[in-house]
Amino acid sequence: RLAQKWSLKNKINLINSLSNHKGALLDIGAGTGNFCETSKQNSWDVYGVEPNEKAREIAAKKNIFLHQSIEDFKGQQFDVVTLWHVLEHLPDLENTIKAIQKLLKPNGVLIVAVPNYNSFDAKHYKRFWAAYDVPRHLWHFSQKSMSKLFSENMKLLKTKPMIFDSFYVSL
């Protein structure tokens, strides 16, 4: 619980350091709404997407009302879009990234956390590394692959390890 609070605080600090003002934030893969709740408490106008109905119900008990799909936000744009350990689960990366780009305001910030298959943990545990998580993790990323994936229409501002973000080392 302490690690989760610390991680949420670090995520808010990261967003605040990359965005020049607190505005509309969309969290894709919002789970039970913990990050949305923390963002709301820190003066962000929060929206979220979570396909899992039970997770949305838990979030609703925290007064965080999540949508089922990013399709619900067609025509809207956000100052910040986050994907915390979501990208590796999505089957159609190219079209998903295009859809996310349309959701960003000009000069908006996209923050993506993914497991790093070049991390110390991955090298140490090799084929037993927890984040390989097949079949749920469809993709595996490194800093280089993430840079290449987003280089076409976006400017990479920063890559950094996210300590305690998950039980494995993340980008």
Place the predicted regions along the sequence by residue.
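Conserved SAM-binding loop
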Residues: 10-128, 138-153
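Conserved SAM-binding loop and adjacent beta-strand
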Residues: 1-11
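Short glycine/proline- and charge-enriched loop/turn segments
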Residues: 1, 125-134
